[in-house]
């Protein structure tokens, strides 16, 4: 298996900053926004975006932690470890994940969100969009488009869990 680094720490930070600026531009009332990170790396990304929003706009946006496992169609887990610190009804929720691939994780995350309230709108921000969708799901905010083959794998490493920031592509 060959492994190649396709995004380094500087490029990753720039992508997160770009996503943050796009969130500011597209959301007129940031007080209505809730960032919802999909466990695990999506939560880290959400906190980084939250921190940048605080620096740029002097606003404290709430961050939810969304567990997709109880809502997936391929595995069954009963315990839902989702943490949503505010009522999301009539709020603009931006789901955040590290990689968008088939769309199935996002579908499960949306199912989880609507079990907790009725957002006025749900957006999607991803660090990497690798293509190969199985469901009609599209990201509103994309850090990097990295086309892959079905046999390749994208691995996102983040300082919080892996000790460094980078994106790797693994293939034959």
Curated annotation (Swiss-Prot):
One of its GO terms (molecular function) is RNA binding. Transmembrane segments: none annotated. The keyword Transferase applies. InterPro entries: PRibTrfase_dom, PRTase-like, PyrR, PyrR_bifunctional. Keywords: Glycosyltransferase, RNA-binding, Transcription, Transcription regulation, Transcription termination, Transferase. A motif (PRPP-binding) lies at residues 93-105. Gene3D superfamilies: 3.40.50.2020. Its EC number is 2.4.2.9. GO terms for biological process: DNA-templated transcription termination. It holds the Pfam family Pribosyltran. Belongs to the purine/pyrimidine phosphoribosyltransferase family. PyrR subfamily. Regulates transcriptional attenuation of the pyrimidine nucleotide (pyr) operon by binding in a uridine-dependent manner to specific sites on pyr mRNA. This disrupts an antiterminator hairpin in the RNA and favors formation of a downstream transcription terminator, leading to a reduced expression of downstream genes. Also displays a weak uracil phosphoribosyltransferase activity which is not physiologically significant. This is Bifunctional protein PyrR. It comes from Streptococcus sanguinis (strain SK36).
